[in-house]
C-alpha cells in the first residue's frame, strides 16, 4: 500500500522541505511554503526520452535546419523568433481576461486552415463554450480538434492518439496527475504536469503551448521551476480596459528575448498593430509642456512613445510622486539628479509621470526623455514637436551612450521627426546619412538648455 507523507513546497522556486520554514533556504523568500500530502511512489519527471542516451562527440551531432511553423500572426512570429519550433514547449502567462486563450484560438484557426492538425485541450470551459468563443473569431476547418479534460493520463493518451502538430493546454493550473494526492494547481501538480508535457513534446516532435495563470505580483502561479522547464515564456501585458495588449518574450531558447508584439483587442479577437510607433503617437498634443517623444528598443524593434510629465506645487506636507508605465524608483532617482545637478527646486512639487498607450518600459535609454519632460513641465516650456529624445543619465548628470542609435534614428525619420537630442558619444558613432538634425549632449545641463 502506498504511503502518504506531508511535505512543504516553496510556491516561488519549488524547494521541498519536510517541515514548514518561514524563509525558503533556496530563494530566500518569506512565507512561501505550502503544505501538501504526497504519496510515496516511483519518482516521475525523470523518464528518459526516446533518443539515445549514450554520449556523443559534439562534432558528430547533426543539426537540421527545420522550417518553423508560421502562426499566420506576424507579431507573434516576431516574438517567437520566426514561428513555432516543432517539439517545443511554450508558456503563455497574463492576467485574467487579457486575451491568452483568444490569441491561441486564433493561432489554432490559422494552423487548421493551413491543413495542420491542431488539438485544443481545455480544463476551464466546455466544448460548447469554446465553440461560442471560436465563432467570434471566424470559421474553423476540420483539422481543429477540441478536448475537455483535466486528467494528465487521459490528455497524454489523446495527444498520442491524434498526433497533432500543435497542441494547447488551457490551463496548466487545472490539470492534475492521479499519481499525486495534492490538488490541481499545487506546486507538485504543476511541476509534474509540465514535465509530462515536456516529454510528450520532445518525444513526438509536437509543439505544445500551455496557458498559465498569474499571481497578484504578475508572475506565473506555481513554482519558479516552471519557467525554467519550458523553452519559451511569453507574457501578455496591458490593462483589460485598455485597447492595446503587449506580448513580451522573456525567455526564448530559439530566438531573441525581450521582443514584443503589439495587439489591439477588437470584437473579432486580437488584431495586429503593424506600426506601434505611429499608433502610440496618435492624438499626441502639440505645443504642450511636459510632453516628449522617446525611442526605446524592445528586443530588435525601435518603438517611439510619448512620455508625459506634470509638475505642480504641492498642497500637502509631503509631495506626491506617481509613475505609470515607468519604474517609480527610477523617476525618483532622475528627479534627485535634477535637484542636485541642475538646481531645480522639486522638493515642494508634486510630480506625475505617465507613459502613454498603456505601455511599460524599463530601458535606461528613456532617462533623458523623462528628465526633459519633468523640466519642461516645471518651466512650463514646450519642447519642439518634431524632436525625438534618447539617452541614459548617470547620477553625476552625465548623458551616456546607448545601443541601437542608428535604428532609433531611422524609425524616427520614417515618422517625420526632424531633430534628435541624443548622447554626444552616439553622434560620433553614427555613420549613416540622415536628414535629421542630430543634437549631441554630454550632460543634463546641455540638454535642458535646448528646452
Which stretches of residues belong to each language-model region?
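Conserved Walker A/P-loop ATP-binding site and its immediately adjacent core
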Residues: 123-129
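Conserved RecA-like ASCE P-loop NTPase motor core of nucleic-acid helicases/translocases
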Residues: 118-122
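Peripheral, non-AAA+ core regions of ATP-driven protein-machinery
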Residues: 2-12, 16-78, 85-93, 98-109, ...
